[in-house]
Amino acid sequence: MALQTYYPDLFNGAWSFSADGVDFKYFQLIDIYQDENAFVNEHGMQRPSYRAKDGETIFSIKREIMMENQIGRNDSFIYSGGQWGGWNAVFGPKLEDGTPSTIWDPLTGKIDQSIAAQWTKYDLRLYTEKNWQTLGPKLQGKLNIWMGDMDNFYLNNAMHLYQESAKKMNSRGQE
């Protein structure tokens, strides 16, 4: 979906199921723009990362990051080979030594808003809205997305925001 969006002339279609990272207001259950902490919400409750089919939380974001810290080189999830390390490597700026920066502290979960601001160029909803005049016609009929209403990793929330945005853009006659 991201490749189709960023390179609409190069690809002739995308078929996406439970797409990751389409709107960073819901990066799973983290709003990277507003939240202060990735591990706990504004009420002090642990943020779930993965849920079972019945909705029961299997593990939290904090637990997942702690596990990735354990398997990562230098005790950092950035080197774990896991999803969280991968997203930081792709979306975030690099440090002077080439190491990917982390959007949040790997031990406390405190979000670094200066890094979050640099992720915005990879927020597909924001990018699509900003570039809709030229992008809309190029994407016509090319994005094929399927999403259930209860994704295990809470990806459906971001997709709902993306869908609402697309409906608004299309209703303004900018198809």
Specify the residue positions occupied by each region the protein language model found.
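Non-catalytic cap/lid and distal C-terminal segments of serine-dependent acyl enzymes
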Residues: M1-E175
